A protein has these predicted regions:
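Glycine-rich flexible loops
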Residues: 1-282
Length: 282
């Protein structure tokens, strides 16, 4: 049984505040929804920051996207509600959807580098395999059409090329967790690449992890082939990224090549020190 409608509206606003505070949406970006009955969905309005939402901002639509009840503030439903409705229709078990632009995950979507597998246990258990849908224009039918082929019975998150992400689950809180875990994982991946090598779980480690996941009541189709090494088969684009070494912090400041020598660094420090001393004496 669903909680009272007013409580669901309040939770929608609270989740919006969390999304905004985490920096997952700027301006009036993003949208989220909750399925409140077989043919009704509660969704965020268009044209408002998720950080400014309150319960009276929420809109109610039918499964065709028509706004079926007047909003007390005159708000109109999000223009991207078609994505939400398509997911609800394909997956009746899904009760909440969040579309957002988490920066680290969106960077992967823009670079169109598949999220690597077999690296971080929490990502494997709570996200599983995350695929990237081809680019489609926001607010058009092409957007849900691009996502639906990637949604299987175990899918809970999809990246949208050059756009953002969409997460979905059995309730709004768990859907938010999926979003938060996604961006945290992508941030860790980017930090790891800056350090250098990436350690991947081997076949045995990955199989054992997926068996634990199954014990948690979270089935994963990859368990059937993990012993053969199917996990991580698309990791190469990520592992091969960052082919150019970062530039060093010191240079001659005249367009010359960067230098890492101790002498050059000490000379630069001395020059700056001399300038500071001279300025203090004036």
């Amino acid at each position: 049984m669903n909680p009272p409608l007013w409580q669901m509206k309040k939770q929608m606003a609270e989740i919006g505040h969390r999304i905004w505070q985490k920096g997952f949406c700027a301006g009036n970006e993003g949208n989220h929804s909750v399925r409140i009955s077989e043919d009704r969905v509660l969704c965020t309005p268009t044209g408002i920051s998720k950080g400014f939402l309150d319960a009276d901002d929420m809109c109610i639509v039918d499964m065709d996207g028509n706004q079926v009840e007047p909003n007390p503030k005159g708000r109109k439903r999000t223009s991207e509600v078609l994505v939400h409705l398509a997911i609800y229709k394909k997956r009746p078990d899904v009760k909440a959807v969040i579309h957002s632009h988490p920066p680290h995950a969106t960077a992967f979507a823009i670079a169109q580098i598949p999220l690597p597998e077999g690296i971080h246990p929490e990502a494997e258990v709570f996200l599983g395999k995350v695929r990237t849908a081809p680019y489609a224009t926001p607010s058009k039918q092409a957007l849900p059409d691009s996502i639906l082929p990637l949604i299987g019975p175990e899918t809970n998150t999809v990246l949208m090329a050059n756009h953002g992400s969409v997460s979905f689950s059995f309730d709004l809180t768990d859907t938010y967790y999926k979003l938060e875990i996604l961006d945290a994982y992508c941030r860790v991946l980017l930090l790891t690449k800056q350090l250098g090598s990436v350690n991947q779980l081997d076949k045995g480690q990955m199989t054992e992890l997926l068996e634990v996941k199954k014990q948690f009541g979270l089935p994963d189709e990859r368990l059937s082939c993990s012993k053969e090494g199917c996990v991580g088969s698309e990791n190469q684009p990520f592992l091969a990224s960052f082919p150019v070494n970062p530039t060093t912090a010191s240079c001659d400041c005249n367009g010359g090549e960067a230098s890492t020598s101790t002498e050059s660094f000490e000379a630069m420090v001395q020059a700056i020190t001399n300038q500071i001393v001279d300025s203090m004496g004036k």
